Amino acid sequence: SVGGTGGKSPNLPGPVNTPSRFRSVAQAMATVPVATAAMGAVAGLPAGRLVASHFSVMSKSTAQIITAGPAVVERAMGEKKTKDELGGWKVHTKNGTVDNGADDERACIEEIKRFLSFMPDHVNKLAPVIDCDDPVDRCEESLLEVVPRDRRVAFEMRKVIKAVFDEGSFFEMGKGYGRSQIT
């Protein structure tokens, strides 16, 4: 912003939001898993960078993603809102801006570690494979009850996932957004 420089243009090669800055983000996303966390108030370009990821998480206790703070909103709209009401985890996990909310900063890091645990060590390796102690001839009887015969009747897909996936191997992303999808 020129206004913040006393009316003089800063001596930078171009605006902060030049396409080249997001081009590097897109290039990284095509090569490596990109995971981000909001652990405090995030606005502007950092907010764009936060959501330009394969997995994003925000701290329920300390993070907000906002375009303007409570004072600006009150002056412009005449409404008193907290930072959490404007852009806390409840807002952004529901609208799909971020995938998950975690209790605190430590939990954010743990979620990112869990997400990355499904990925290979580097781009030229395959994803990790773990031994399974499930009997190969196991028949999951609960599936007969969970999935209705009438294809027009809704059912709880998470019960199917729990029955089919290895114990503890399902990592859900974006549960608060898009009730008809499970990621």
Describe each region flagged by the PLM.
Residues 1-124:
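Conserved catalytic cores of soluble enzyme domains
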Residues 2-7, 31, 138-145, 156, ...:
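Gly-rich Lys/Arg/Thr-decorated short loops/hinges at beta-loop-alpha junctions or inter-strand turns
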Residues 29, 65-66, 109-112, 130, ...:
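Weak global preference for isoleucine
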Residues 40, 75, 111, 127, ...:
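A sequence-level detector of short, solvent-exposed, charge-rich linear segments
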Residues 63, 142, 178-181:
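Generic structural motif recognizing short loop/turn segments at the entrances and edges of beta-strands
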Residues 100, 104-158:
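Terminal amphipathic helices with adjacent charged low-complexity linkers/tails
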Residues 149-183:
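Non-catalytic terminal/interface segments that mediate subunit docking, oligomerization
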